[in-house]
């Protein structure tokens, strides 16, 4: 049975790279009728925070990525990790290294001066008992290192990249599997070791993660072998790149799912877009889809090896398509809390509110656009420069005065658009101006600007809440 996992570290909010990895894991698990599991890798005691764990869980739920079972907490598995390290020590596959940080820094400085890649030189790999005793007598603490055969070839078949080959000589020397601690203790177990132990304990069948973990995979395969554990299948997805082709990072600005959510992106559009970051839709499939639809056809044959450049225009287009597909009631449910945050109160009639979202919906790209565009319907807007220039045009105020006089004699409820058309025609004729001048001037008076949604519907909505006449009067 397919069992995959997402293993985020709660040292920050949910990052889009982690979220895209979650999407690929979820899609594969659902495609294979398997399980999508969560493991919280909280072994970084200083940086891991419960609020980040909560943020990650809430972000996954918001995106529609449900998981199976309860999340595994890595820090609760520490004794299992230490037991594995003890096994490696007893087999002679790991050893204590007493080299101080100062000695290691000096080693790296010498390597840099000689234009050599930084690596541990395995200096304490074969200490005699007397040498170990001498270091312990000095009071030195020790890390625990796993022996890496530099002549070893490490091979695996990657579901994305095909046959892979790494050499032991390229892994930087014997790797540290436990932090520095007194010689009679095992320090805190480190990433490559704990991941192997936890994946085996969770019976993970496939490890799906970013290509920046490829070197870790080579190291972890050696640990699987040393501990006689079943080896999962690996798939390394392409990295998400910024528009310049570099790995997307916090320096690029928006990278947290929190940020995308706050900007007004929908979970449907964001999940859709993240799926397209490195995966190609099958021929004949629309690139606007639900996660459930993608899961039916997802496989690694269509996952690209090359990095996926983040395209804001594409994401914005997808988000607009999602918003435009929503029923007015659903859009109102999404916009009403944003309007409430502004202190705006909706009229008692649901019909007016639905008419407003029907008017604004086709022009929305982000949900937050619905705040800016709705503002003139809740607050009297300031007159922008282009609106002031329009109102200074010859005949503009005369036609508005004619329209105001008509409305004061026979108030319009905002219900009959045909009646509004007749009033506009009459006012333009009375003022002796073209209807187009009146239309532009009316928009300037009602909205404070010359761009906006359908004018007659706008006027109708403002008339229904008694806001059309005050706005005409202030311009005269």
Swiss-Prot record:
<dbReference type="InterPro" id="IPR020752">
    <property type="entry name" value="Glu-tRNA-synth_I_codon-bd_sub1"/>
</dbReference>
<keyword id="KW-0547">Nucleotide-binding</keyword>
<dbReference type="InterPro" id="IPR014729">
    <property type="entry name" value="Rossmann-like_a/b/a_fold"/>
</dbReference>
<comment type="similarity">
    <text>Belongs to the class-I aminoacyl-tRNA synthetase family. Glutamate--tRNA ligase type 1 subfamily.</text>
</comment>
<dbReference type="GO" id="GO:0000049">
    <property type="term" value="F:tRNA binding"/>
</dbReference>
<keyword id="KW-0030">Aminoacyl-tRNA synthetase</keyword>
<dbReference type="InterPro" id="IPR045462">
    <property type="entry name" value="aa-tRNA-synth_I_cd-bd"/>
</dbReference>
<dbReference type="InterPro" id="IPR020751">
    <property type="entry name" value="aa-tRNA-synth_I_codon-bd_sub2"/>
</dbReference>
<dbReference type="InterPro" id="IPR004527">
    <property type="entry name" value="Glu-tRNA-ligase_bac/mito"/>
</dbReference>
<dbReference type="GO" id="GO:0008270">
    <property type="term" value="F:zinc ion binding"/>
</dbReference>
<comment type="subunit">
    <text>Monomer.</text>
</comment>
<dbReference type="InterPro" id="IPR008925">
    <property type="entry name" value="aa_tRNA-synth_I_cd-bd_sf"/>
</dbReference>
<dbReference type="Pfam" id="PF00749">
    <property type="entry name" value="tRNA-synt_1c"/>
</dbReference>
<comment type="function">
    <text>Catalyzes the attachment of glutamate to tRNA(Glu) in a two-step reaction: glutamate is first activated by ATP to form Glu-AMP and then transferred to the acceptor end of tRNA(Glu).</text>
</comment>
<dbReference type="GO" id="GO:0006424">
    <property type="term" value="P:glutamyl-tRNA aminoacylation"/>
</dbReference>
<dbReference type="GO" id="GO:0005829">
    <property type="term" value="C:cytosol"/>
</dbReference>
<dbReference type="InterPro" id="IPR001412">
    <property type="entry name" value="aa-tRNA-synth_I_CS"/>
</dbReference>
<keyword id="KW-0436">Ligase</keyword>
<feature type="short sequence motif" description="'HIGH' region">
    <location>
        <begin position="8"/>
        <end position="18"/>
    </location>
</feature>
<dbReference type="InterPro" id="IPR033910">
    <property type="entry name" value="GluRS_core"/>
</dbReference>
<protein>
    <recommendedName>
        <fullName>Glutamate--tRNA ligase</fullName>
        <ecNumber>6.1.1.17</ecNumber>
    </recommendedName>
</protein>
<feature type="binding site">
    <location>
        <position position="250"/>
    </location>
    <ligand>
        <name>ATP</name>
    </ligand>
</feature>
<dbReference type="InterPro" id="IPR049940">
    <property type="entry name" value="GluQ/Sye"/>
</dbReference>
<dbReference type="InterPro" id="IPR020058">
    <property type="entry name" value="Glu/Gln-tRNA-synth_Ib_cat-dom"/>
</dbReference>
<dbReference type="GO" id="GO:0004818">
    <property type="term" value="F:glutamate-tRNA ligase activity"/>
</dbReference>
<dbReference type="GO" id="GO:0005524">
    <property type="term" value="F:ATP binding"/>
</dbReference>
<feature type="short sequence motif" description="'KMSKS' region">
    <location>
        <begin position="247"/>
        <end position="251"/>
    </location>
</feature>
<dbReference type="InterPro" id="IPR000924">
    <property type="entry name" value="Glu/Gln-tRNA-synth"/>
</dbReference>
<dbReference type="Pfam" id="PF19269">
    <property type="entry name" value="Anticodon_2"/>
</dbReference>
<keyword id="KW-0648">Protein biosynthesis</keyword>
<dbReference type="InterPro" id="IPR020061">
    <property type="entry name" value="Glu_tRNA_lig_a-bdl"/>
</dbReference>
<keyword id="KW-0963">Cytoplasm</keyword>
<keyword id="KW-0067">ATP-binding</keyword>
């Amino acid at each position: 049975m397919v069992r995959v996992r997402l293993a985020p570290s709660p040292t920050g909010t949910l990052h889009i790279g982690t979220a895209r990895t979650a999407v690929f894991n979820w899609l594969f698990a659902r495609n294979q009728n398997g399980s999508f599991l969560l493991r919280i890798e909280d072994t970084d005691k200083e940086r891991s925070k419960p609020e980040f764990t909560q943020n990650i869980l809430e972000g996954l739920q918001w995106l529609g990525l449900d998981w199976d079972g309860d999340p595994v907490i890595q820090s609760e598995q520490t004794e299992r990790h230490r037991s594995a390290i003890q096994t490696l020590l007893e087999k002679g596959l790991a050893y204590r290294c007493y080299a101080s940080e100062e000695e290691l820094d000096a080693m790296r400085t010498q390597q840099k001066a000689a234009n050599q890649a930084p690596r541990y030189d395995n200096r304490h790999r074969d200490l005699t008992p007397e040498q170990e005793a001498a270091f312990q007598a000095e009071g030195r603490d020790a890390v625990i290192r796993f022996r890496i055969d530099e002549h070893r070839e490490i091979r695996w078949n990657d579901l994305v990249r095909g046959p892979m080959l790494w050499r032991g000589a390229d892994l930087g020397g014997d790797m540290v599997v436990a932090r520095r601690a007194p010689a009679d203790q095992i320090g805190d177990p480190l990433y490559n070791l704990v991941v192997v132990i936890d994946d085996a304990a969770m019976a993970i069948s496939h490890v799906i993660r970013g290509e920046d973990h490829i070197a870790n995979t080579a190291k972890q395969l050696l640990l699987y072998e040393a501990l006689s554990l079943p080896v999962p299948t690996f798939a390394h997805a392409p990295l998400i790149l910024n528009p310049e082709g570099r790995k997307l990072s916090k320096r690029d600005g928006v990278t947290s799912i929190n940020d995308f959510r706050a900007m007004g992106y929908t979970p449907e559009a964001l999940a859709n877009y993240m799926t397209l970051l490195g995966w190609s839709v099958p021929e004949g499939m629309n690139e606007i889809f639900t996660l459930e639809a993608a899961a039916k056809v997802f496989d690694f044959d269509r996952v690209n090896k090359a990095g996926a450049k983040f395209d804001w225009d594409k994401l914005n287009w997808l988000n607009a398509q999602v918003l435009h597909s929503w029923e007015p009631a659903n859009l109102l449910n999404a916009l009403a809390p944003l309007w409430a945050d502004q202190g705006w109160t909706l009229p008692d009639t649901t019909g007016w509110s639905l008419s407003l979202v029907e008017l604004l919906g086709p022009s929305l790209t982000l949900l937050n656009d619905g705040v800016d565009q709705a503002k003139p319907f809740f607050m009297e807007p300031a007159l922008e420069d282009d609106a002031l220039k329009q109102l200074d045009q010859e005949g503009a105020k005369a036609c508005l005065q004619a329209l105001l006089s008509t409305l004061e004699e026979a108030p319009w409820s905002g219900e009959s658009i045909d009646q509004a058309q007749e009033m506009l025609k009459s006012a333009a004729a009375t003022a002796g101006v073209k209807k187009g001048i009146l239309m532009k001037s009316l928009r300037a008076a009602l909205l404070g600007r010359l761009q906006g949604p359908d004018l007659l519907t706008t006027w109708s909505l403002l008339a229904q809440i008694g806001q059309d006449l005050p706005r005409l009067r202030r311009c005269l």
